[in-house]
């Protein structure tokens, strides 16, 4: 009988140890609060920053893909997300439709200053001030080699992410007339 008593005491210790962590968490209000906070943060990370959709409410329909064309600076300006819902910006002589990233390039976005403008100088020099914007065509000839390389990197990123809708015209330059076949070829090249 004496041999049975230590064995039973050992079983009780194992039973207490098995639920020990759970009892430790539930037994302390501080631990319970920290567990709740960790679970909430994990939920937020996994869920992402998607805004909650209201029942019966849909966001604005996506704009149709813009046909390829060239722009002067004046023709580009209305596409700032305010005067026109579409947002265009030029990078290194190419015009891109960045509407789907309006969170960044829209009126309230961190890069909103570039909407409807030639963003080349600002992106090349990492300047988000109005001084980086020119009212006339900017040939960017005064950029140093590092800034030119930075600009090419930005151009490459934009080419990969956004729809290239045309080129930025110099003063007096004639626009290119794009055919539907060229548009289709450009879309096919982007898919590859």
From Swiss-Prot:
Subcellular location per UniProt equals: Microsome membrane; Smooth endoplasmic reticulum membrane; Mitochondrion outer membrane; Secreted
Could you state one GO biological process linked to this protein? heme biosynthetic process
At the top level of its lineage, which domain of life is listed?
Eukaryota
InterPro entries in the record = Cyt_B5-like_heme/steroid-bd, Cyt_B5-like_heme/steroid_sf, MAPR/NEUFC/NENF-like
What Pfam families is this protein classified in? Answer: Cyt-b5
Matches recorded under Gene3D superfamilies: Cytochrome b5-like heme/steroid binding domain
Q: Which annotated residues bind heme?
A: 111
Q: Which UniProt keywords apply?
A: Endoplasmic reticulum, Iron, Lipid-binding, Membrane, Metal-binding, Microsome, Mitochondrion, Mitochondrion outer membrane, Phosphoprotein, Receptor, Secreted, Steroid-binding, Transmembrane, Transmembrane helix
Q: For the Cytochrome b5 heme-binding domain, which residue ranges apply?
A: 70-169
Q: Does the keyword Endoplasmic reticulum apply?
A: yes
Q: Which residues lie on this side of the membrane: Lumenal?
A: 2-24
**Which positions form S-S bridges?**
none
Major location, coarse class?
membrane
Entry's free-text remark on domains: The cytochrome b5 heme-binding domain lacks the conserved iron-binding His residues at positions 105 and 129.
Miscellaneous note, as given in the UniProt record, is: Non-classical progesterone receptors involved in extranuclear signaling are classified in 2 groups: the class II progestin and adipoQ receptor (PAQR) family (also called mPRs) (PAQR5, PAQR6, PAQR7, PAQR8 and PAQR9) and the b5-like heme/steroid-binding protein family (also called MAPRs) (PGRMC1, PGRMC2, NENF and CYB5D2).
Self-association or partners: how does it assemble?
A: Homodimer. Forms stable homodimer through hydrophobic heme-heme stacking interactions.
- Which family is this sequence assigned to? Belongs to the cytochrome b5 family. MAPR subfamily.
Role this protein plays: Component of a progesterone-binding protein complex. Binds progesterone. Has many reported cellular functions (heme homeostasis, interaction with CYPs). Required for the maintenance of uterine histoarchitecture and normal female reproductive lifespan. Intracellular heme chaperone. Regulates heme synthesis via interactions with FECH and acts as a heme donor for at least some hemoproteins. Forms a ternary complex with TMEM97 receptor and low density lipid receptor/LDLR, which increases LDLR-mediated LDL lipoprotein internalization.
Q: What is this protein called?
A: Membrane-associated progesterone receptor component 1
